[in-house]
């Protein structure tokens, strides 16, 4: 990058974690929980300088005295005041930059309501005085990060999953399917099935422990019934986990029963199709001529696709649904937890992208609706 060029900022706001950094980098500089906490009680100590709100890791560490709120639900911003706090924290505390000096690329969920994109645009230009900004769809960025412009992305994070077919860089809105089943639901389900084993996890603090157990020990079985039999007849699948207080717990079939929910949502009482069927349904909503390209370029993205065994299982399940001669390829990049951010970093540093930014001047002339004309 030339010295006179200012690095663009790339901010990927997820339901669970916010990923932020500089365009051209290969990984985000800052990754922190998308939470805002407010004190539950009036401060007693004089001169403690208690703040009226905490964001991210600080909110997480003080969660005992705070009420925690997630401003992004199912991938979509629902609380703008808190969202503004998260962005403020991102710029000033995490990245330590002056937002008025850097163009910023934000990400949005597929099928994000129009009013939401306008609000994001308005806050960037009016509250943070950004010189330029752009809003890109998360799944499209994941596809770019894998070096493709055509394919179908299964993006599964903490709050929502989507299957997004993309042709020549454009998402096909009529074929996008949203599935309200993601990481947080899997954590809740693991809490429930661990309770059946006699371990009690109930508070929000304990939920974080269960999330860690899920991330470290869960995996997807290639054949669920077979795996259940193996687990019942031997202890080969059992693993132990040490809790923060030193107590050690043992976990067996829960390891693969937890992520099996992605393929069988009925486990948590949801009447929806699993991720394999949703991906297939999404492909079937597309023009018959491009289906072959989608089957051969099925890209996994997001933290909830990090389970070992998930790609093989997807390959098996989609092969069973697709026409018998169809070539099916599941792409699971090792860095897929951050592939949305990485795609944003790639896009914002392309020389051809520089004329795509919405400038402050364009915003002042046209208002927030400019976002629909320039970002699609």
From Swiss-Prot:
Gene Ontology MF annotations: ATP binding; hydrolase activity
Q: What is its EC number?
A: 3.6.4.-
Its main localization is cytoplasm
- On the tree of life, the source organism's domain of life is Eukaryota
What does the UniProt entry say about where the protein is found?
Cytoplasm, Cytoskeleton
The alphabetical list of record keywords is:
ATP-binding, Cytoplasm, Cytoskeleton, Hydrolase, Nucleotide-binding
Q: Which Pfam families match?
A: Actin (PF00022)
Recorded GO cellular component terms are: cytoplasm; cytoskeleton
Q: Which InterPro entries match?
A: Actin, Actin/actin-like_CS, Actin_CS, ATPase_NBD
Q: Which SUPFAM superfamilies match?
A: Actin-like ATPase domain
Name the reaction it catalyses: ATP + H2O = ADP + phosphate + H(+)
Q: What does this protein do?
A: Actins are highly conserved proteins that are involved in various types of cell motility and are ubiquitously expressed in all eukaryotic cells.
Annotated family? Belongs to the actin family.
> Per its record, how is this protein called by name?
Actin, non-muscle 6.2
Species name for this entry? Hydra vulgaris (Hydra)
Tell me the classification of the organism that encodes this protein. Answer: Eukaryota, Metazoa, Cnidaria, Hydrozoa, Hydroidolina
């Amino acid at each position: 990058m030339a010295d006179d060029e200012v690095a663009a900022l790339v901010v990927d706001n997820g339901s669970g974690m916010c990923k932020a950094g500089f365009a051209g980098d290969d990984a985000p500089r800052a990754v922190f929980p998308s939470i805002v906490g407010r004190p539950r009680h009036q401060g007693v100590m004089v001169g403690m300088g208690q703040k009226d709100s905490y964001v991210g890791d600080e909110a997480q560490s003080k969660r005992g005295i705070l009420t925690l709120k997630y401003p992004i639900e199912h991938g979509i911003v629902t609380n703008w005041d808190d969202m503004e706090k998260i962005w403020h924290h991102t710029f000033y505390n995490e990245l330590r930059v002056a937002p008025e000096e850097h163009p910023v690329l934000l990400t949005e969920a597929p099928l994000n309501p129009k009013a939401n994109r306008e609000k994001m645009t308005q806050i960037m230009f009016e509250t943070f005085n950004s010189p330029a900004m752009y809003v890109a769809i998360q799944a499209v960025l994941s596809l770019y990060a894998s070096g493709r412009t055509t394919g179908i992305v299964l993006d599964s994070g903490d709050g929502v999953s989507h299957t997004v077919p993309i042709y020549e860089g454009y998402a096909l809105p009529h074929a996008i399917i949203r599935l309200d089943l993601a990481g947080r639901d899997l954590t809740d389900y693991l809490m429930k099935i661990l309770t059946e084993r006699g371990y009690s996890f109930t508070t929000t603090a304990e939920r974080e422990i269960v999330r860690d157990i899920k991330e470290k020990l869960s995996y997807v079985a290639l054949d669920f019934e077979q795996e259940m039999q193996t687990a019942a007849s031997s202890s080969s699948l059992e693993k132990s986990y040490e809790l923060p207080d030193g107590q050690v717990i043992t976990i067996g079939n829960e390891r693969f029963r937890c992520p099996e929910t992605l393929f069988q949502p009925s486990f948590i009482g949801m009447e929806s199709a699993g991720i394999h069927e949703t991906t297939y349904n999404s492909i079937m909503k597309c023009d018959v001529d491009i289906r072959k390209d989608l089957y051969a370029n099925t890209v996994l993205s997001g933290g909830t696709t990090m389970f070992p065994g998930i790609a093989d299982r997807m390959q098996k399940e989609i092969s069973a649904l697709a026409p018998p001669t169809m070539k099916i390829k599941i792409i699971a990049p090792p860095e897929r937890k951050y592939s949305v951010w990485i795609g944003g970093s790639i896009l914002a540093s392309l020389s051809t992208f520089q004329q795509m930014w919405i400038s402050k001047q364009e915003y002042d002339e046209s208002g927030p609706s400019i976002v629909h004309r320039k970002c699609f």
